[in-house]
A protein has these predicted regions:
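Beta-rich nucleic-acid/ligand-interaction surfaces
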Residues: 40-44, 203-205, 264, 492-493, ...
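Glycine/proline-enriched, intrinsically flexible loops and inter-domain linkers
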Residues: 5, 23, 28, 40, ...
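Mobile "lid/hinge" segments at catalytic clefts and subdomain interfaces of large enzymes
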Residues: 114-129, 133-139, 150-160, 164, ...
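Terminal amphipathic helices with adjacent charged low-complexity linkers/tails
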Residues: 183, 187-217, 393-421, 427-428, ...
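A carboxyl-terminal module marker
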Residues: 2, 19, 439-446, 467, ...
Length: 813
C-alpha cells in the first residue's frame, strides 16, 4: 500500500522526517518495504538558480542572438549567449548552470556559439518543465533574490512515497488516516510532540426535496447501506491539489467526482461509489442478489455472467454495480452528469471476497471490503465526500440521507487482566502504561479497576477479539525491542516416550521396503458387505457413518487385511501379479453392548499389514520360486527378531479360520495380548475379491509391537573366541509333534552349550508310516571358555536324543 508523506502530514503534525516515519511504522508492525523520494519536477531543477541580467548586447555574427552577462551572486559575472527575443538588461531570470540536467537527459555544457563562449542557459517555462510556453525566457519578479535555487523560488514540492507491506489483518491501516492513527499512538507513547487532525464534517447538512429511495433486499450482504442525493454538480477536471495527491500514490485522475471518491477511499479507508442519477431507472436504488446467469457489463467493458450469490446495486430494471467490487459501464459519472447518487456502505466480507474471486476482479474497494471494512465509518465517509463534492464540483444535497441499518453494529468488548497481560508480555510494564497505549489507540474504557479493565475495541480493528489480540496491540506500540531477554529460561521438560513410536515405525517401514515391499495407503472408509459373514470381525462391530457418500464407504474398517485384498485384486486385474505390499494405518471397532453415545463405546488402534502374492520374475542367477506361507512367516519373524523378540517365547494358536485357511496367531507371553496373525488367505475371502491366485498376509498389532520394543533391553557381550560345532540329527516323529516343542526341549537340556537349533528338512512319504514325519535338525554348540572336545559334544547330543525319545516318542533314523 502506498502512503504519501506530505498527505500523511496533513493528519498528524510532527517533526519526523520521512526516514524516521518509515522506521517508526516498521517498529509498530506496518513494515515499510520501500521509501522513495518524489519530486514535482524530476531532478528538482538542481543547478538552476535566480540570476540578474546585468548587460545584454547583440551578437556581432547573428541577427537574433544576444550576449548577456549575469550576476549569479559570485564575484565574477557569467557570460551566456541567449536567443530569446525578450531578454533584456535588468531582468531577473532562471539560469541553468554548466552541469545541470534538464528533463531526462539534456545536460548543460560550456559551449561556443558563433565564436562566443557561453557558460549556461537562460530558461523558458517548457525547458524547465513547469509550463508549455516557449515564446521567451521566464522573467521573474524584480524582488527575486539572486542566487536562490529555482526549487525554492518556485516552491516546488518534494514528497516521499512510503510503500507498506500491509498484512491481511491490518485493513485498519489501509488509508492515510489509518496509518496516522498508529503513528500517533507510537509518538504519544514515546513522548514525541504530535497532534492528530481528523477532518471535520459538522458542516454537512441535509437539504430540501425528495432523495432517491433505497430498498435493500439482501440484508445479509449489506448490513448497512447509505445513499446521498446531490444535484447540480459540474463534472470537470479536479483541482491541482487533488490531482497531485492521487498521482503521488499512483492513481490516474479521472474527473472531480470520481477523484473525490478515490481520495476519500485512500484518506479514510472507506470505499464509495457515485452513480449518475439520470441513469437510475425507476428512480430507485435496489440492493439485491443477481439472478443466475444474468448479464452485466462492468466499467472495463467486459460482459460478465453473474451468479445468484453475487450482490448487486441495481435500479428497478437492471444492475448498475457489482457491489463492493466494480462499477457498471452504463451508470458511471461522465462529463454530462449533473446529478449524482453517492453510495457509502458496509458489505459482508465473505460475499465480496467470493464475488471478487469468482469474477477475477481485484480492486481497491474489494481489497478493503473482503478484509472487513469499518461499519461505523460509513456515515462519516459519506458526509466527507459530499462536502468535498459541494466544495469542488458544486451542487446541493437533496432530501435526507437514505440509510438501511436495521441492526446496529456494536463495538466488540474485551475484558482485560493486567497481571495476565504482563505475564504474557514477559515484563511488568505498568498498568498506567497499558492504559495509556490503549487510550492512544482509541480504545474506550468502559470499566477500570486495579487489576484489569473492560474496553470497547475501535470498530476499524477487525482482527481484535480477545485479550491476546490486545496484548499484541500493546506490544507493538510498547516496542518488542523494549522487552529484555530473560536471564533464566522457564520451561517444562517432558521426557520423550520410550520407545519413540515414530522411530520404531520408520525402522519397520525401512525394513519392509528394503525387503521389496511397497507401501500402500487406503481409505479408512469401506463397505459393510465385507464384514457380513465374518466372525472375527463381525458386522455389528463396525463403526457406521451416519451420512455415507455411498454404500461402498458406509463403515470404518476393522482390519487392514480386507483393504489390502482390494489392492491386490486391483493390481492383478491390470496384469501385475507379483505383489509384495505393506500398509500402516488405523482400524476401528464399536462395542455393540454399549449405547454408542460415549467415546468408550469405540476403539481405535493402529496396525501394520503385509501381503505376498504371485511369483517374482526369474533371473539367470536364481529361481526365486513362488511367494508362499513360509516366505511370509520368515519376513514376519525376522521383523519381530529385529526388535528383540524371542519368537519361541511367544504364545501361538491357530489363526482365525474365516480369514485364513492356515496360519498362526502370536500373543505376547503372560498378557495374551495379540501381537500378530499371519497365514494363507482363505479361498472364500479370495473369491469375495475375485482373486484367483494364493495370497499370504499378516497383520501386526502396533501397540503390542511397541510394548515388545519397550520390554527389550539391549545387552552386550564379548565376541566368542572358541569355535562352534555343528551336529545333525534325523528323527522320526508323530505328526502331532511340532518343531517348536522340540526346540524348547532342546534348549532346556543343552542350555549351557546349545546356541542354535534349526530345522532343515521335513519328509513325509515312502517308507514313512502314515501319521509319521521325519525331521532333520541341526544343532550348533559352543563353549565360551574353551574348545569343545568330541566327548563334550557327544554328551549333549546323547541327552538331546534321550529327551526326544522320552518326551515325544522319537526314533533315530
Amino acid at each position: 500500500m502506498k502512503i504519501s508523506y506530505n498527505w500523511l502530514k496533513e493528519y498528524i503534525e510532527c517533526d519526523l522526517a520521512p526516514e524516521a516515519v518509515a522506521e517508526a511504522l516498521t517498529s509498530i508492525g506496518l513494515e515499510v518495504d520501500s521509501l522513495e523520494q518524489i519530486e514535482e519536477i524530476p531532478g528538482g531543477l538542481a543547478g538552476v538558480i535566480v540570476a540578474e541580467v546585468v548587460e545584454c548586447v547583440d551578437h556581432p555574427d547573428s541577427d537574433h542572438l544576444h550576449i548577456t552577462k549575469l550576476n549569479t551572486g559570485e564575484a565574477e559575472l557569467l557570460q551566456v549567449v541567449c536567443g530569446a527575443p525578450n531578454v533584456a538588461a535588468g531582468q531577473k531570470v532562471l539560469l541553468a548552470t554548466v552541469g545541470t540536467v534538464l528533463g531526462e537527459d539534456f545536460k548543460i555544457k560550456k559551449s561556443k556559439i558563433r565564436g562566443v563562449e557561453s557558460f549556461g542557459m537562460i530558461c523558458a517555462e517548457d525547458e524547465l518543465g513547469i509550463g508549455e510556453s516557449h515564446d521567451g525566457i521566464m522573467v521573474l519578479d524584480p524582488e527575486a533574490v539572486v542566487g536562490t535555487p529555482a526549487k525554492d523560488y518556485l516552491g516546488l514540492a518534494t514528497d516521499a512515497l512510503i510503500e507498506i507491506g500491509l498484512t491481511a489483518n491490518r485493513v485498519d491501516a489501509a488509508s492515510h488516516i489509518g496509518v496516522a492513527r498508529d503513528l500517533y499512538a507510537y509518538l504519544k507513547h514515546n513522548d514525541i510532540p504530535c497532534k492528530l487532525n481528523i477532518p471535520d464534517v459538522s458542516a454537512f447538512a441535509e437539504g430540501e426535496g425528495e432523495a432517491i429511495p433505497v430498498e435493500v433486499l439482501a440484508a445479509d450482504g449489506a448490513p448497512r447501506y447509505t445513499g446521498t442525493t446531490i444535484k447540480g454538480v459540474k463534472v470537470a477536471a479536479s483541482p491541482e491539489w487533488l490531482q497531485k495527491k492521487l498521482l503521488a500514490i499512483g492513481l490516474r485522475p479521472i474527473n472531480n467526482v470520481v477523484d473525490i471518491t478515490n481520495f476519500v477511499l485512500h484518506e479514510i479507508g472507506q470505499p464509495l461509489h457515485a452513480f449518475d442519477l439520470a441513469k437510475i431507472a425507476g428512480g430507485k436504488v435496489v440492493v439485491r442478489r443477481a439472478e443466475e446467469g444474468e448479464k452485466f457489463v462492468t466499467l472495463d467493458g467486459v460482459e460478465r455472467t453473474l451468479s445468484s450469490a453475487d450482490l448487486m446495486i441495481a435500479n428497478t430494471e437492471k444492475p448498475m454495480c457489482l457491489a463492493g467490487v466494480f462499477g457498471g459501464e452504463e451508470s458511471g459519472v461522465t462529463e454530462s452528469t449533473t446529478d449524482i447518487f453517492l453510495e457509502s456502505a458496509y458489505f459482508n466480507p465473505v460475499s465480496i471476497r467470493k464475488s471478487s474471486k469468482r469474477h477475477t476482479l481485484k480492486t481497491d474497494a474489494s481489497f478493503r471490503y473482503e478484509r472487513g471494512a469499518d461499519p461505523l465509518v460509513v456515515e462519516y465517509a459519506a458526509k466527507r465526500a459530499a462536502l468535498l463534492i459541494q466544495e469542488i464540483a458544486g451542487g446541493q444535497i437533496v432530501g435526507k440521507v437514505q440509510e438501511f441499518y436495521p441492526e446496529k453494529i456494536e463495538k466488540k468488548v474485551v475484558e482485560l487482566d493486567y497481571n495476565h497481560i504482563e505475564n504474557f508480555v514477559g515484563k511488568k510494564i505498568g498498568h498506567d502504561v497499558i492504559e495509556g497505549i490503549l487510550e492512544n489507540l482509541a480504545y474506550e474504557f468502559i470499566e477500570k479497576a486495579e487489576t484489569g479493565a473492560k474496553v470497547a475495541v475501535p470498530s476499524y480493528m477487525v482482527d481484535v477479539y480477545r485479550e491476546c489480540d490486545i496484548v499484541e496491540e500493546i506490544l507493538r506500540i510498547y516496542g518488542y525491542n523494549n522487552i529484555e531477554l530473560p536471564q533464566a529460561m522457564r520451561m517444562s521438560v517432558n521426557a520423550p516416550q520410550k520407545p519413540e513410536p515414530e522411530q520404531v515405525r520408520k525402522a519397520v517401514s525401512d525394513f519392509l521396503a528394503a525387503n521389496g515391499f511397497v507401501e500402500t495407503m487406503n481409505n479408512s472408509l469401506t463397505k459393510s458387505d465385507y464384514y457380513a459373514k465374518l466372525k472375527t470381525f463381525p458386522e455389528e462391530k463396525c463403526v457406521r457413518i451416519m451420512n455415507p457418500l455411498s454404500s461402498d464407504l458406509n463403515v470404518m474398517r476393522q482390519t487392514l487385511l480386507l483393504n489390502g485384498l482390494e489392492v491386490i485384486a486391483y493390481n492383478i486385474n491390470r496384469q501385475i501379479t507379483n505383489i509384495k505390499t505393506f500398509e500402516y494405518g488405523s482400524v476401528y471397532s464399536f462395542d455393540p453392548e454399549k449405547d454408542g453415545k460415549t467415546l468408550d463405546s469405540y476403539e481405535e488402534h493402529t496396525c501394520y499389514a503385509l501381503f505376498i502374492s504371485g511369483q517374482p520374475e526369474k533371473s539367470w542367477r536364481t529361481d526365486p520360486g513362488k511367494g508362499n506361507y513360509f516366505q511370509l512367516k520368515g519376513y514376519l519373524e525376522l521383523l519381530l527378531k529385529r526388535f528383540g523378540c524371542d519368537i519361541y517365547s511367544l504364545e501361538t494358536e491357530a489363526a482365525p479360520a474365516d480369514i485364513f485357511s492356515e496360519g498362526l496367531a502370536y500373543n505376547l507371553p503372560g498378557s495374551h495380548q495379540p501381537l500378530a496373525v499371519m497365514g494363507t488367505i482363505a479361498p472364500a475371502r479370495l473369491k469375495q475379491f475375485g482373486i484367483k491366485q494364493p495370497v499370504f498376509a499378516a497383520e501386526i498389532n502396533w501397540p503390542a509391537l511397541l510394548e515388545l520394543v519397550k520390554r527389550n533391553k539391549i545387552r552386550y557381550k564379548e565376541l566368542p573366541k572358541f569355535p562352534e560345532v555343528r551336529r545333525d540329527l534325523a528323527i522320526l516323529l508323530d505328526e502331532s509333534v511340532s518343531y517348536a516343542d522340540l526346540r524348547k526341549s532342546a534348549f532346556r537340556v543343552g542350555k549351557k552349550l546349545l546356541k542354535q537349533v534349526g530345522l532343515f528338512d521335513v519328509y513325509r512319504g515312502d517308507k514313512i508310516a502314515e501319521g509319521k514325519k521325519q525331521y532333520a535338525l541341526s544343532f550348533v554348540l559352543q563353549d565360551l571358555d574353551k574348545t569343545l572336545t568330541d566327548n563334550d559334544v557327544e554328551k549333549v547330543m546323547s541327552k538331546l536324543l534321550s529327551t526326544f525319545q522320552n518326551e515325544f516318542g522319537a526314533t533315530l533314523r
